[in-house]
Amino acid sequence: MDLIAGESSKVLRKQGFRSLKLMSVDMEQELGNELEPFGADYGRLDNGLIYYVRRNSKPRMRAALALAVKVGSVLEEEDQRGVAHIVEHLAFSATTRYTNHDIVKFLESIGAEFGPCQNAMTTADETIYELFVPVDKPELLSQAISILAEFSSEIRVSKEDLEKERGAVMEEYRGNRNATGRMQDSHWQLMMEGSKYAERLPIGLEKVIRSVPAATVKQFYQKWYHLCNMAVVAVGDFPDTKTVVDLIKTHFEDKRSSSEPPQIPVFPVPSHEETRFSCFVESEAAGSAVMISYKMPVSDLKTVKDYRDMLAESMFLHALNQRLFKISRRKDPPFFACSVAADVLVARVRLHGFSEREISVVRALMMSEIESAYLERDQVQSTSLRDEYIQHFLHKEPVIGIEYEAQLQKTLLPQISASDVSRYSEKLRTSCGCVIKSMEPKSAATIDHMRNVVSKVNSLEEEKMIAPWDEENIPEEIVSEKPTPGDITHQLEYPEVGVTELTLSNGMQVCYKSTDFLDDQVLFTGFSYGGLSELPESDYISCSMGSTIAGEIGMFGYKPSVLMDMLADLETALQLVYQLFTTNVMPQEEEVGIVMQMAEESVRARERDPYTVFANRVKELNYGNSYFFRPIRISELRKVDPLKACEYFNSCFRDPSTFTVVIVGNLDPTIALPLILQYLGGIPKPPQPVLNFNRDDLKGLPFTFPTKITKEFVRSPMVEAQCSVQLCFPVQLTNGTMIEEIHCIGFLGKLLETKIIQFLRFEHGQIYSAEVSVFLGGNKPSRTADLRGDISVNFSCDPEISSKLVDLALEEIVRLQKEGPSQEDISAILEIEQRAHENGMQENYYWLDRIIRGYQSRVYAGDLGASCKILEEGRLRMRESLAPQTAQAALQRILPHPCKKQYTAVILMPQRSRFGFLSSIFSSRSEGPYIRDTKILAGIAGLGVVVFGIWRYSRK
């Protein structure tokens, strides 16, 4: 059957890896020339700046740029703690050539979105500025490189610039002071104890952020930002590297640092033989955890032996993680209480080692990974290559090229034995710079308790009282009896989208698209109409737990711990789908007990998280307390009927005739079609239809948006004050121009997000970021009905000014409805959308989603090509018609007009003390409309499993 030509190239490339010759290696041979990283045009300018330039065509007409600076927070003095990060912020605010965040506006105007395509990061040792820009016009690359040149020596540090940026930096600081941030900071300080690193977290100190003078920031910038400590990296779809090198010279060659090159000091982290213990109590923690860390000297990666040792270490970590996963899936896992069982893993390896079978599984996995990298060596993302060169500059990590690395791994991996891997465990002794830390929501473990556990494990090891690892039996084949292949009863070609659609003899519809984006990637997903929305409310809770219970029991006929040892190729994946449809999951009391215990722990964890409490209340409020959006409570979990849950899960994956499966990737039809026919076509069709729903007869989700303005505070106990705001508006799209309206609301979401960030961050300096999201997922998949949903604005801020910022955000949206956006605003969001579309057209994920949307679209009437064409034409019509006037009209039409007449505003705030609450009762009228305290509800969100992209479709 002639499908799409040229697919035999994948087979040839795989044969290319398999025929890759083994090397005769000298262990002392150097990996490569440190001064000549593979693939790059590499050099140094007279002023000390290093450059790396490389041609790479993925994605097409794009370039990944970076300025890497060997300057981080560890260089700060006590009164400068946080200044390195502040400098990074100021870079995008103003330079000699750019003011008032003009850099951000310019980059957005060429389609480089703020955040994803223009960003920076500060660590203890370095600062990295990153840009991802289009280069289809010659001047764009030059302008982008000129911006990096400005960052190198022309950042403006004035009092006005600093004052405007303090709020954004402070909000980033506040956002880091949640449970996760506090635990990470505490662990960092414990690990780095005795070193300057322990007291130089990049985010800095609140008092410095709020009050550091501009002169101090400028002094730090001028002292440390020296060109000899910088490198510029450019990887992209360039005609040639020489032109790019010339651009770098044009923009950087005349730059001069204002002082002599500073010597970057080294701050050693002292080792210690005694084990350090710490018990950290975090009332908002999601659960209890123990972290065991070992400090080791950094190993140079210079010789083949160094590389072999690195592979052995990686194999050790893979094998140990596999054991940990398998322990977590046992009937009595030791992870719900402090137990010796989890701590003997490394000691067991020292005594008994890993088995050859375990290491053969790890070796096969790593060989598969390097084979995939080799096959896709010409399809590596420019951002990945850019990051390699950044690490070469900052940490002297060798860049040796994937061809050489594949040859090395193919030669070395078979030579690394189980005993070689097991030997690595000798480095992980509690006398080798070991730090053990417990983290709990309530104090239970003590340092003495942990010290006794370590002592007991050491004694058991000395007495050789630790039993060997008990291995599970792994089946030779996932499908023991191969099914009889089905037939193709109908075939259609859609050349306009490059897909082939098959109807199989069991009724399953399979659509596939062959691509050459990645030589070793195939994605697939499947859907069927009818899901949880079709159930009565009384069955909802039990049935919604079906995928969770089935996932732990073994929805493919095997435990998850058994399947993890199998390599995933197309045949294996299709076999798992066959098993999904033919396995009858039956709940066992012991297994179900473990699953429900884990679910209860998850609910309790979410009760402790203020942000989950907040999100649950937002959903309750915006969707009329609908059971579909309400969090599951522990009392409801305890009423779950496991048998009903599993029966529902089994019924969802019983009738193949209700499913459409879409496959996208580098498919060789001569290999893929027989597998599709055997494992998808071989799924038996039941004698009577099961859950066979007509799309137009499905129910929408039961929800109603408040008809009146609703403003509410959610007050939650917090260790440190946090504040999150969600401002939400109802939307309704009418059927007459539905395709254009769906695209239009996407553009409006991006417009609102851009303007809110510009207004609240760049103009008022009070937020770090904002997100605008659109929800239309509660509607039934109808061809004719209107769509209703909501559009929400989310940001975090200082609790003291949250109400003020809500009012400012509302005023900005009112202004946009009244005056409309500028042409500059419209041009920027059109450019961002177009660039994202162009990037997506080169990705399998994008095409998978596009085809699924084609099938699920209201215009789909059996012709996928026509559906995709109508959707794309709607997108193009929307782009052509979008202008300041049409955007203004859409804001008035789709949102309430004026927007202040119907909305919800929910604000997460720290819980007040009882005395504060009592006193506020008498003054609540002066607080304005935000006077309602809410009941805090515990919840668990999204307990579910996506299994190889197969799900039952319940709502669009």
From Swiss-Prot:
Positions of modified residues (N-acetylmethionine): 1
Residue ranges of coiled coil: none
Origin superkingdom: Eukaryota
The protein's name in its UniProt record: Zinc protease PQQL-like
GO CC terms: chloroplast; plastid
Any one Gene Ontology BP term: proteolysis
Positions of Zn(2+) binding: 85, 89, 172
Cofactor(s) for this UniProt protein: Zn(2+)
Co-factor remark: Binds 1 zinc ion per subunit.
Organism this protein belongs to: Arabidopsis thaliana (Mouse-ear cress)
Family: Belongs to the peptidase M16 family.
SUPFAM superfamilies: LuxS/MPP-like metallohydrolase (SSF63411)
Residue numbers annotated as active site: 88 (proton acceptor), 165
Pfam families recorded: Peptidase_M16, Peptidase_M16_C
First-level EC class: hydrolase
InterPro entries from the UniProt entry: Metalloenz_LuxS/M16, Pept_M16_N, Pept_M16_Zn_BS, Peptidase_M16, Peptidase_M16_C
EC id: 3.4.24.-
UniProt keyword list: Acetylation, Hydrolase, Metal-binding, Metalloprotease, Protease, Zinc
